[in-house]
Structure formats: structure tokens, C-alpha cells
Amino acid sequence: MIDMRTMAEEYARAYSDKTRIYFIEKYLSTFNADKGKKTQFMLFPRQKAFLRSIAEHGRSIAIKHRQAGITTTAGAFIACEIALADPESPITVLVIGNTIDLAMQMVTKIREFLFQIPLWFWDFELYKKDMESPINRKSALFKICNTKELILKNGCRVVARSSGPDASRGVGGVTWLIFDEAAFIENGKDVYASALPTVSTGGHVIMISTPNGKDQLYYETYRQAKACLLYTSPS
């Protein structure tokens, strides 16, 4: 059983590292295709560069090469942000995918990572109770828990939406706005324009995608990022 001093030291270390690299590699696991099972989440250099970018900049864009793990890394980062969020200032995450299934996949990744985080990060009283079963963990952490929406006891919220003019309807004060497969979103500029006003002051925007020609949203945003006009692209 972990003691209070160690808890405080670990929490302080995890909180102070805004990239969440320490948190992810220390406490989270992910599926390792080579070993055919879940293993400790050891980040690759490209994934670390991505985390440094989104931690440092308000707007970031990343190329998602096949099996690069960028979406998974983003999900792990968001889970860490939620676990470390101040209940007096909870975060809201809006995930917009080119399909609802894609957006739901990211919410599912976030949920799975949240379940991995030690209970004492949330509440020491929970840690002292018998919360090892998934049912107890679910009731302890979540008010709403499904593939389209997560609402946690600390006030944080994660919402999955498909792209469209109403993608952000009913969601405000967004702390993290994430576009997954942004290059494949139809009428991408319009979707972006309608969703951007939901982002709160100091909020962040992340675009992730595999390239899809010279589309109006992702390609143009990436081009501007390379020219240092708007977004930052991790190198």
C-alpha cells in the first residue's frame, strides 16, 4: 500500500510535467502488437515530440502515419489531464471525427486509460476502499460512461461527435478540441469554423490525420503550420 508521502511526491511530479510523459510511462499501458498483449506505455520519440507540442502550444497539428500511435498518445494525454484536473475548474474535451465511430474510438481509448490510473490520484478515500472491480471503479469515477460521452465525478466531460454543422451543439467551454482524421472531414473549414467558438479562453485545438490530398482544412492548416502562421507541427 502506498503511503501519503509517496502519493504527494508522485502527484507533484506528474502534475509538474505538463507533457504528461512521466505520467503516461509510469502508470499507463497499451497494446503491444509485437508481444500480443498490453505492456507499459513506452513512448517513441515522435510521440514525445507530439506531447511536447500540445503541452506548449495552443494549437497543434500532427500527421498520423499508420500504426504511429498518435491518436492513442492523444487519448493517454487527455486521460492524464482529466485525472489531474482541479474539480473547481474541470476540463471539457470535444472529439470530432470524420465519422461518429472514429470519435467514439478515441473516447473509448480515453476511458480505458482513465480506468488504469491509480485511484489515489482521484481520491485517497476511494483508494482505501475495495475498488478493484471494474464495476466499483466505474461507479467511483463516472456519472455518465458510454462510448459517446463521459462525465466524471470531478466535473470533467468528454464528448464524441461526428463532423457536421452541428458537431459542437450543446457543448461549450471546451478546453481541448480534437479533430481526428481532419483531412477526411467533409466541408472541413465550415465544421472547424462552427466548432472553434466553443473553445474557452486558454483552450487548445489539436488536429490529427493521415494526409488526404490538398483538402481545405487539414492540408491548409498543415501548410500554415510549416510556415509558422497559425498552428505548430511537432518536428
For every predicted segment, state its role.
Residues M1-S233:
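Phosphate/NTP-binding elements of NTP-utilizing enzymes
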